[in-house]
């Protein structure tokens, strides 16, 4: 991942990943090559990417020193 040596998943993010059937590798792929990036609420960052023509994964994270702390993961159907 560009600039991130470590990725830490908070419990809420893990719950959402389990709920949506998204694994760590899919989250990492969104961070490595997002289709879109920006600023989310509370000065957090987001990265999102289409996994298929109809499924969008959005990753909400905080940026630390060489670390991305994953706060939440969302799956949206388009």
Each predicted region: which residue ranges?
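Ribonuclease/tRNase effector modules and their secretory precursors
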Residues: 1-78
């Amino acid at each position: 991942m560009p600039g991130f040596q470590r990725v830490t998943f908070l419990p809420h993010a893990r719950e959402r990943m389990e709920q949506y059937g998204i694994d760590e590798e899919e989250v990492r792929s969104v961070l490595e090559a997002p289709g879109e990036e920006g600023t989310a609420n509370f000065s957090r960052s987001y990265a999102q990417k289409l996994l298929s023509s109809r499924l969008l994964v959005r990753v909400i994270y905080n940026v630390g020193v060489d670390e991305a702390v994953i706060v939440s993961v969302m799956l949206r159907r388009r």
